[in-house]
């Protein structure tokens, strides 16, 4: 059985879609009260969808609830609701929430700032990203940094790459591929042999160096085409024959510790 926090992370990654019929007879205030008091995350998500589908003007009451609730799940889910409703007046609250003690609150605050394209949040996002140690929060912050095109994050991304593994490293490589420059190719190429991050490294190099490694495979490990996919093999061969063209860099050798 999935833990409540695992379900929470899944919900974090699931966009709000108009798939729940609005309960027209119930007021937004009543729905939000039930939403705050609900502890089952799936039911809580259902109530949030009902609110956002029913009331396009629910941004202000969602913000008031997020500011006043003692339930951290209510707080981070309300942030998602405000982002869905494009309620940009919540930006100061989101920025303050980047320092929250709950990782899911920080994650969603960062992601909502990106989704809402709050460009003047770059300083706060950079500070949060620099200090962040939670993998899921790192992932969502890296997505927000990409959405806001915060290129000043590149040195921080380079620092975090060898520290985190798995999916978090994939997100970081993807962010570096979008925010970095051709000077970042050697660092990224060091992950081409990684079973988890190899495909992300391939795509990042394709983006930064403008090199085509062939069509994207639709499968990964265990798929029809097997692993590594042809484009990653092509990227490895390309790097082997071209790496002498790049200067040596001290942080180009991955040292995994997380």
Regions found by a protein language model. Name each.
Residues 27-29, 33:
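Immediate post-signal-peptide N-terminus of mature secreted/exported proteins
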């Amino acid at each position: 059985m999935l833990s409540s926090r695992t379900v929470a992370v899944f919900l974090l990654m699931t966009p709000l879609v108009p798939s729940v019929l609005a309960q027209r007879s119930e007021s937004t205030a009543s729905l939000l009260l039930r939403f705050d008091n609900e502890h089952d995350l799936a039911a809580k998500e259902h109530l949030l969808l009902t609110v956002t589908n029913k009331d396009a003007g629910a941004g202000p009451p969602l913000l008031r609830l997020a500011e006043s609730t003692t339930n951290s799940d209510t707080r981070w889910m309300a942030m998602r609701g405000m982002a869905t409703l494009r309620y940009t007046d919540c930006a100061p609250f989101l920025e303050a929430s980047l320092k929250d003690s709950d990782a899911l609150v920080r994650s969603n605050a960062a992601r909502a700032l990106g989704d809402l394209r709050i460009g003047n949040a770059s300083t706060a996002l950079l500070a949060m990203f620099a200090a962040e140690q939670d993998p899921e929060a790192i992932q969502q912050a890296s997505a927000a940094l990409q959405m806001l095109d915060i290129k000043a994050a590149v040195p921080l991304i380079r620092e975090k790459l060898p520290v985190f593994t798995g999916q978090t490293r994939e997100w970081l490589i993807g962010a570096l591929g979008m925010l970095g420059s051709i000077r970042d190719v050697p660092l990224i190429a060091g992950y081409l042999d990684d079973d988890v991050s190899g495909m992300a490294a391939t795509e990042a190099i394709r983006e930064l160096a403008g090199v085509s490694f062939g069509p994207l495979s639709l499968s990964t490990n265990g798929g029809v085409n097997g692993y590594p996919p042809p484009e990653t093999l092509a990227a490895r061969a390309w790097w082997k024959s071209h790496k002498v063209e790049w200067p040596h860099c001290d942080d180009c050798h991955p040292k995994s510790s997380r």
